[in-house]
């Protein structure tokens, strides 16, 4: 904690009293919220609260959590200013939906600046689940007409500029698939910072080439969010994806808007916000229907199925998976945008496997995981690692311990060279599931091996902390 004042915080004391909270009760609620919102867990107790009341200002994240807890207790919004923390910067930069493109560019600049120039000095950004809900409402109710003003000093943009961004996105995506998001993450941010942000304020999406430029910038920004998500920088990812959505909307690309909402659904589900994940996936296919290709629609329904499986809604899961399968089987893929080319039968089978694992159906999880692996291209190393871990879990659910450990060990060997927080988290989940077999010699051998090659349980990656 940083002691910024010795004056008692009477504003905080007044709001705590109004909320009827005790020091112990407030500390407990702050701890619980910090462990469930996708950010770094905060350790505090009644002594910590006493220090806050005496005038010690905690870290920015803790101040935000205090305000959110008091908001919940009172049933009305409590700002940082109302509890005596007026000096803190707004951590929600990048989460607000900008009316003007210039505002989005400023937000994107702040995000890339944070990532590139102060990665170790800045406190981790937190995930704000309410921001997803606000975006869903905006997407489903907003006018199709973009209200952005034309640039004050327009610069000519050529097809070459558009192709340069498209090719950069393809290259960084290849790195992401093969080596994990940690490899291209800062490269994507640097490209945005150096090649895109200086130009985009002078480009109008009202012109055909300008619209294409915005579409490609949105796709690149989406990738920045996806690589951040894969490395566990959840707050950073949420902000990149929000701005990617705004840029895609400026380009008038409803299919890409849906794709970004589907990515948000994926992240929300990963962080345990299952209903919000369902809402995001449904918003994707409702808003993009008639504008997205069948392959893209299949992805949206697959994301809905995955979130429904987390809530154990078996009937709804089956319906969503069958709908995804029907969409994928419709017509050719010639009209698919480049960013959906990866989503093939192997990817859909992987989604089936994930869902059946979460529903506890070991037989079907095993079947679809094996089919996905058979159909997969070897270039998608990370996707294969996910699916093989699901297969290992399915073997474990079926009681085949030897097969489960054999597959999991091969994934752990691959994970050593992958810079992917999510792959590590899959293996952590598998290790947790082994607790019932902890006395088995083969299990002890595997756990010893895993400890030697994977991040320790105290590492930021293993504990699902935000590293932004």
Task: Describe the residue ranges of each PLM region.
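Short amphipathic recognition helices of helix-turn-helix/homeodomain-type DNA-binding modules
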Residues: 2-29, 38-141, 151, 450-452
């Amino acid at each position: 904690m940083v002691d910024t004042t010795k004056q008692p915080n009477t504003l905080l004391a007044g709001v705590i009293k109004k909320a009827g909270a005790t020091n112990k009760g407030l500390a407990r609620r702050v701890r619980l919220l910090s462990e469930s919102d996708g950010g770094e867990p905060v350790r505090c107790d009644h002594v910590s609260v006493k220090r806050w009341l005496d005038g010690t200002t905690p870290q920015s994240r803790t101040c935000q959590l205090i305000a959110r807890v008091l908001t919940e207790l009172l049933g009305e919004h409590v700002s940082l200013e109302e509890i005596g923390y007026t000096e803190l910067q707004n951590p929600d930069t990048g989460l607000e939906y900008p009316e003007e493109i210039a505002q989005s560019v400023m937000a994107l600049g702040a995000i890339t600046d944070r990532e590139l120039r102060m990665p170790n000095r800045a406190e981790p950004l937190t995930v704000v689940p309410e921001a997803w809900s606000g975006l869903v409402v905006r997407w489903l109710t907003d006018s199709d007409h973009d209200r952005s003003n034309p640039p004050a000093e327009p610069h000519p943009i050529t097809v070459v500029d558009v192709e340069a961004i498209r090719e950069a996105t393809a290259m960084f995506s290849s790195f992401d698939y093969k080596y994990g998001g940690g490899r291209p993450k800062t490269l994507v941010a640097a490209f945005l910072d150096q090649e895109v942000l200086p130009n985009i304020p002078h480009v109008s999406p009202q012109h055909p080439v300008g619209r294409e430029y915005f579409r490609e910038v949105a796709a690149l920004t989406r990738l920045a969010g996806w690589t951040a998500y894969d490395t566990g920088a959840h707050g950073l990812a949420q902000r990149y994806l929000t701005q990617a959505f705004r840029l895609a909307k400026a380009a008038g690309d409803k299919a890409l808007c849906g794709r970004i909402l589907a990515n948000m659904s994926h992240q929300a589900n990963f962080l345990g916000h299952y209903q919000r994940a369902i809402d995001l996936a449904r918003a994707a296919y409702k808003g993009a229907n008639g504008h997205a290709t069948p392959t893209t629609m299949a992805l949206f329904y697959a994301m809905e199925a995955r979130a429904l499986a987390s809530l154990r809604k078996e009937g709804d899961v089956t319906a969503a998976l069958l709908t995804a399968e029907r969409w994928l089987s419709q017509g050719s893929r010639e009209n698919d945008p480049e960013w959906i080319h990866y989503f093939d039968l192997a990817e859909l089978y992987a989604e089936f496997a994930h869902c059946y694992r979460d529903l506890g159906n070991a037989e079907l999880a095993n079947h679809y995981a094996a089919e996905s692996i058979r159909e997969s291209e070897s270039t998608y190393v990370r996707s294969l690692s996910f699916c093989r871990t699901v297969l290992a879990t399915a073997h474990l659910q079926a009681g085949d311990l030897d097969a489960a450990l054999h597959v999991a060990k091969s994934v752990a060997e691959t994970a050593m060279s992958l810079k992917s927080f999510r792959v590590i988290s899959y293996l952590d989940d598998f290790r947790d599931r082994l607790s019932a077999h902890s006395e088995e010699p083969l299990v002890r051998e595997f756990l010893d091996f895993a400890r030697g090659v994977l991040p320790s349980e105290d590492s930021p990656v293993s504990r699902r902390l935000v590293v932004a």
